[in-house]
Amino acid sequence: MVIKEDCINNLARWQADEEAHSCFQCKTNFSFLVRRHHCRCCGRIFCSSCTENFVNYNKKRVHALQKKNSDVESPPYRTCNECYDNLLHLNLLVSSTNRDVRLSQTSVPPNALALSAPDSNTDEDAEILEDSVDQSGTACRSEESSQNEEDHFCPICNSDLTQFPDEEETRKHVEDCIQRAENAQQHTNTSDAADDSVKESPAFQNRMLVYKISPNTTDNAIKECPICFENMEPGEKVGRLECLCVFHYKCIKNWFHKRAQMTAAQKGNGHAFVKRNFCPFHDAVF
Protein backbone atom coordinates (compact mmCIF):
# COMPACT_ATOMS: atom_id res chain seq x y z
CA MET A 1 0.00 0.00 0.00
CA VAL A 2 1.32 3.43 -0.97
CA ILE A 3 1.05 5.87 1.95
CA LYS A 4 0.89 9.59 1.19
CA GLU A 5 3.15 11.84 3.21
CA ASP A 6 0.34 14.25 4.06
CA CYS A 7 -1.88 11.59 5.64
CA ILE A 8 -2.45 12.35 9.32
CA ASN A 9 -2.11 8.68 10.30
CA ASN A 10 0.96 7.74 8.27
CA LEU A 11 2.77 6.80 11.50
CA ALA A 12 0.04 4.40 12.61
CA ARG A 13 0.61 0.65 12.31
CA TRP A 14 -1.56 -2.46 12.42
CA GLN A 15 -1.22 -3.83 15.97
CA ALA A 16 -0.59 -7.56 16.24
CA ASP A 17 -3.34 -9.56 17.94
CA GLU A 18 -0.95 -11.09 20.47
CA GLU A 19 0.07 -7.62 21.69
CA ALA A 20 -3.39 -6.76 23.00
CA HIS A 21 -5.03 -8.62 25.87
CA SER A 22 -7.60 -5.93 26.59
CA CYS A 23 -9.43 -3.12 24.78
CA PHE A 24 -7.21 -0.07 24.29
CA GLN A 25 -10.02 2.27 25.37
CA CYS A 26 -12.23 0.60 27.99
CA LYS A 27 -9.61 -1.99 29.13
CA THR A 28 -12.10 -4.88 28.92
CA ASN A 29 -10.22 -8.19 28.71
CA PHE A 30 -10.62 -10.10 25.47
CA SER A 31 -12.18 -13.55 25.62
CA PHE A 32 -14.18 -15.97 23.53
CA LEU A 33 -17.18 -13.63 23.82
CA VAL A 34 -15.29 -10.32 23.70
CA ARG A 35 -13.52 -10.30 20.36
CA ARG A 36 -10.67 -8.15 19.04
CA HIS A 37 -11.38 -5.47 16.45
CA HIS A 38 -8.88 -3.20 14.71
CA CYS A 39 -9.46 0.50 14.11
CA ARG A 40 -8.64 1.16 10.45
CA CYS A 41 -7.39 4.64 11.30
CA CYS A 42 -4.97 4.18 14.22
CA GLY A 43 -4.48 0.40 13.95
CA ARG A 44 -5.09 -0.21 17.67
CA ILE A 45 -7.19 -3.11 18.96
CA PHE A 46 -10.52 -2.45 20.66
CA CYS A 47 -13.65 -4.30 21.69
CA SER A 48 -16.74 -4.15 19.51
CA SER A 49 -18.40 -1.42 21.60
CA CYS A 50 -15.41 0.91 21.23
CA THR A 51 -15.17 0.43 17.44
CA GLU A 52 -18.82 0.66 16.46
CA ASN A 53 -18.33 3.43 13.89
CA PHE A 54 -18.26 2.47 10.20
CA VAL A 55 -17.29 5.50 8.11
CA ASN A 56 -15.64 6.65 4.89
CA TYR A 57 -12.32 8.50 5.09
CA ASN A 58 -11.04 11.46 3.11
CA LYS A 59 -8.50 9.44 1.11
CA LYS A 60 -6.25 12.45 0.56
CA ARG A 61 -5.60 12.88 4.29
CA VAL A 62 -6.40 9.49 5.87
CA HIS A 63 -5.37 6.04 4.68
CA ALA A 64 -7.18 2.91 5.81
CA LEU A 65 -4.88 0.46 7.62
CA GLN A 66 -5.12 -3.24 6.93
CA LYS A 67 -3.38 -6.45 7.89
CA LYS A 68 -0.27 -7.24 5.89
CA ASN A 69 -0.86 -9.46 2.82
CA SER A 70 -4.62 -9.27 3.28
CA ASP A 71 -7.16 -8.40 0.60
CA VAL A 72 -7.92 -4.74 0.04
CA GLU A 73 -10.83 -3.71 2.25
CA SER A 74 -13.66 -1.59 0.91
CA PRO A 75 -15.25 1.25 2.88
CA PRO A 76 -16.93 1.97 5.20
CA TYR A 77 -14.11 1.29 7.66
CA ARG A 78 -14.41 0.21 11.28
CA THR A 79 -13.18 3.11 13.42
CA CYS A 80 -12.65 3.54 17.16
CA ASN A 81 -14.63 6.18 19.03
CA GLU A 82 -11.68 8.51 19.62
CA CYS A 83 -10.53 8.43 16.00
CA TYR A 84 -14.11 8.98 14.86
CA ASP A 85 -14.44 12.09 17.05
CA ASN A 86 -11.11 13.47 15.87
CA LEU A 87 -11.78 12.80 12.18
CA LEU A 88 -15.21 14.36 12.45
CA HIS A 89 -13.75 17.41 14.16
CA LEU A 90 -11.07 17.74 11.44
CA ASN A 91 -13.64 17.36 8.61
CA LEU A 92 -11.94 14.19 7.34
CA LEU A 93 -15.05 12.00 7.11
CA VAL A 94 -17.00 11.82 3.87
CA SER A 95 -20.23 10.19 2.79
CA SER A 96 -20.41 7.34 0.30
CA THR A 97 -20.68 9.98 -2.46
CA ASN A 98 -17.39 11.56 -1.27
CA ARG A 99 -19.06 14.62 0.25
CA ASP A 100 -18.25 16.07 3.65
CA VAL A 101 -20.58 14.39 6.15
CA ARG A 102 -21.27 17.78 7.72
CA LEU A 103 -22.56 19.26 4.49
CA SER A 104 -26.25 18.87 3.81
CA GLN A 105 -27.60 18.55 0.31
CA THR A 106 -28.53 21.81 -1.35
CA SER A 107 -32.29 22.12 -1.46
CA VAL A 108 -34.13 23.49 -4.49
CA PRO A 109 -36.37 26.50 -3.75
CA PRO A 110 -40.05 25.60 -4.18
CA ASN A 111 -40.49 28.48 -6.62
CA ALA A 112 -37.78 27.04 -8.84
CA LEU A 113 -40.02 24.07 -9.68
CA ALA A 114 -42.25 26.40 -11.66
CA LEU A 115 -39.38 27.13 -14.04
CA SER A 116 -39.60 23.69 -15.65
CA ALA A 117 -43.28 23.98 -16.49
CA PRO A 118 -44.03 24.03 -20.26
CA ASP A 119 -46.03 27.27 -20.04
CA SER A 120 -43.68 29.14 -17.69
CA ASN A 121 -43.12 32.15 -20.03
CA THR A 122 -45.78 34.35 -18.43
CA ASP A 123 -45.05 37.61 -16.64
CA GLU A 124 -46.13 36.05 -13.35
CA ASP A 125 -43.66 33.20 -13.72
CA ALA A 126 -40.94 35.67 -14.69
CA GLU A 127 -41.57 37.53 -11.44
CA ILE A 128 -41.34 34.23 -9.54
CA LEU A 129 -38.00 33.55 -11.24
CA GLU A 130 -36.69 37.02 -10.35
CA ASP A 131 -37.78 36.67 -6.71
CA SER A 132 -36.19 33.23 -6.50
CA VAL A 133 -32.89 34.52 -7.90
CA ASP A 134 -32.91 37.47 -5.49
CA GLN A 135 -33.54 35.19 -2.52
CA SER A 136 -30.80 32.79 -3.63
CA GLY A 137 -28.34 35.64 -4.09
CA THR A 138 -29.11 37.02 -0.65
CA ALA A 139 -28.68 33.58 0.91
CA CYS A 140 -25.33 33.08 -0.86
CA ARG A 141 -24.03 36.45 0.31
CA SER A 142 -25.14 35.64 3.85
CA GLU A 143 -23.32 32.28 3.76
CA GLU A 144 -20.18 33.94 2.35
CA SER A 145 -20.24 36.55 5.12
CA SER A 146 -20.67 33.82 7.74
CA GLN A 147 -17.77 31.85 6.23
CA ASN A 148 -15.51 34.93 6.30
CA GLU A 149 -16.27 35.39 10.00
CA GLU A 150 -15.42 31.74 10.70
CA ASP A 151 -12.09 32.15 8.88
CA HIS A 152 -11.02 34.57 11.63
CA PHE A 153 -10.86 31.70 14.13
CA CYS A 154 -8.47 28.75 14.37
CA PRO A 155 -10.36 25.65 13.14
CA ILE A 156 -8.77 23.54 15.89
CA CYS A 157 -8.62 25.59 19.10
CA ASN A 158 -11.06 28.41 18.26
CA SER A 159 -8.49 31.15 19.02
CA ASP A 160 -9.08 34.54 17.40
CA LEU A 161 -6.55 34.63 14.56
CA THR A 162 -6.84 38.41 14.20
CA GLN A 163 -4.83 38.72 17.43
CA PHE A 164 -1.63 37.59 15.71
CA PRO A 165 0.61 40.33 14.29
CA ASP A 166 1.15 38.83 10.84
CA GLU A 167 0.25 35.97 8.53
CA GLU A 168 3.39 34.02 9.46
CA GLU A 169 2.41 33.91 13.15
CA THR A 170 -1.12 32.91 12.19
CA ARG A 171 0.13 30.09 9.97
CA LYS A 172 2.53 28.85 12.66
CA HIS A 173 -0.27 28.78 15.25
CA VAL A 174 -2.62 26.79 12.99
CA GLU A 175 0.13 24.34 11.97
CA ASP A 176 1.04 23.79 15.63
CA CYS A 177 -2.59 23.07 16.48
CA ILE A 178 -2.90 20.66 13.56
CA GLN A 179 0.26 18.85 14.68
CA ARG A 180 -1.11 18.48 18.22
CA ALA A 181 -4.38 17.17 16.80
CA GLU A 182 -2.50 14.65 14.66
CA ASN A 183 -0.49 13.44 17.68
CA ALA A 184 -3.70 12.98 19.65
CA GLN A 185 -5.27 11.22 16.67
CA GLN A 186 -2.40 8.74 16.39
CA HIS A 187 -2.19 8.11 20.17
CA THR A 188 1.49 9.07 20.05
CA ASN A 189 2.87 10.25 23.39
CA THR A 190 6.58 10.08 24.12
CA SER A 191 6.43 10.75 27.87
CA ASP A 192 4.13 11.56 30.76
CA ALA A 193 4.98 15.23 30.35
CA ALA A 194 4.09 15.06 26.67
CA ASP A 195 0.89 13.23 27.54
CA ASP A 196 -0.12 15.99 29.95
CA SER A 197 0.83 18.63 27.40
CA VAL A 198 -1.31 17.03 24.71
CA LYS A 199 -4.29 16.58 27.02
CA GLU A 200 -4.08 20.21 28.12
CA SER A 201 -3.80 21.50 24.56
CA PRO A 202 -6.84 23.05 22.86
CA ALA A 203 -6.38 20.71 19.90
CA PHE A 204 -7.05 17.74 22.19
CA GLN A 205 -9.78 19.30 24.32
CA ASN A 206 -11.76 21.30 21.76
CA ARG A 207 -14.31 18.82 20.53
CA MET A 208 -17.70 19.88 19.29
CA LEU A 209 -20.05 18.04 16.96
CA VAL A 210 -21.36 20.49 14.35
CA TYR A 211 -24.40 19.59 12.29
CA LYS A 212 -27.65 20.93 10.86
CA ILE A 213 -30.99 20.09 12.45
CA SER A 214 -32.93 17.65 10.28
CA PRO A 215 -35.72 19.22 8.19
CA ASN A 216 -37.94 16.35 9.37
CA THR A 217 -37.73 17.44 13.02
CA THR A 218 -41.20 17.70 14.55
CA ASP A 219 -42.42 20.71 16.52
CA ASN A 220 -42.30 18.70 19.74
CA ALA A 221 -38.61 17.93 19.18
CA ILE A 222 -37.56 21.55 18.58
CA LYS A 223 -35.48 22.84 21.50
CA GLU A 224 -34.48 26.27 22.71
CA CYS A 225 -30.90 27.53 22.52
CA PRO A 226 -29.77 28.14 26.13
CA ILE A 227 -27.75 31.20 25.03
CA CYS A 228 -30.15 33.26 22.90
CA PHE A 229 -33.38 31.56 24.07
CA GLU A 230 -34.56 31.24 20.46
CA ASN A 231 -35.79 27.95 19.00
CA MET A 232 -33.25 25.88 17.08
CA GLU A 233 -35.25 25.44 13.89
CA PRO A 234 -34.87 22.67 11.27
CA GLY A 235 -32.02 23.42 8.88
CA GLU A 236 -30.13 25.62 11.35
CA LYS A 237 -26.47 24.92 12.15
CA VAL A 238 -25.90 23.83 15.75
CA GLY A 239 -23.02 22.58 17.90
CA ARG A 240 -23.19 19.80 20.49
CA LEU A 241 -20.61 19.72 23.27
CA GLU A 242 -19.32 16.59 25.01
CA CYS A 243 -21.81 17.19 27.83
CA LEU A 244 -24.51 16.75 25.12
CA CYS A 245 -25.74 20.35 25.48
CA VAL A 246 -26.75 21.80 22.10
CA PHE A 247 -26.56 25.46 21.05
CA HIS A 248 -26.87 27.54 17.90
CA TYR A 249 -23.45 27.28 16.23
CA LYS A 250 -23.07 31.07 16.01
CA CYS A 251 -24.13 31.47 19.65
CA ILE A 252 -21.61 28.98 21.01
CA LYS A 253 -18.83 30.33 18.77
CA ASN A 254 -19.49 33.87 20.02
CA TRP A 255 -19.50 32.61 23.61
CA PHE A 256 -16.13 30.89 23.10
CA HIS A 257 -14.74 34.09 21.58
CA LYS A 258 -15.93 36.34 24.43
CA ARG A 259 -14.81 33.83 27.04
CA ALA A 260 -11.37 33.64 25.44
CA GLN A 261 -11.09 37.43 25.51
CA MET A 262 -11.96 37.48 29.21
CA THR A 263 -9.46 34.70 29.95
CA ALA A 264 -6.74 36.49 27.99
CA ALA A 265 -7.41 39.74 29.86
CA GLN A 266 -7.23 37.96 33.22
CA LYS A 267 -3.94 36.27 32.29
CA GLY A 268 -2.52 39.48 30.88
CA ASN A 269 -1.76 38.11 27.42
CA GLY A 270 -3.39 38.19 24.03
CA HIS A 271 -3.74 34.47 23.47
CA ALA A 272 -6.26 32.23 25.17
CA PHE A 273 -8.70 29.50 24.28
CA VAL A 274 -11.86 28.09 25.78
CA LYS A 275 -12.51 24.37 25.78
CA ARG A 276 -15.41 23.48 23.53
CA ASN A 277 -16.46 20.86 26.06
CA PHE A 278 -16.60 23.59 28.74
CA CYS A 279 -20.32 24.27 28.56
CA PRO A 280 -21.60 27.84 29.12
CA PHE A 281 -24.73 26.41 30.72
CA HIS A 282 -22.78 24.33 33.23
CA ASP A 283 -20.37 27.24 33.70
CA ALA A 284 -23.31 29.40 34.81
CA VAL A 285 -24.73 26.70 37.10
CA PHE A 286 -21.50 25.52 38.70
From Swiss-Prot:
Binding site for Zn(2+) 2: C39, C42, C80, C83
Cellular compartments annotated: Endosome membrane; Vacuole membrane
Residue intervals of every FYVE-type zinc finger in the record: 17-88
Membrane topology, as annotated: Peripheral membrane protein
InterPro entries the record matches: Znf_FYVE, Znf_FYVE-rel, Znf_FYVE_PHD, Znf_RING, Znf_RING/FYVE/PHD
Enzyme Commission code(s) on record: 2.3.2.27
Reactions that this protein is recorded to catalyse: S-ubiquitinyl-[E2 ubiquitin-conjugating enzyme]-L-cysteine + [acceptor protein]-L-lysine = [E2 ubiquitin-conjugating enzyme]-L-cysteine + N(6)-ubiquitinyl-[acceptor protein]-L-lysine
Entry domain remark: The FYVE domain mediates phosphatidylinositol 3-phosphate binding and is necessary and sufficient for targeting to endosome and vacuole membranes.
Protein name per its UniProtKB record: E3 ubiquitin-protein ligase PIB1
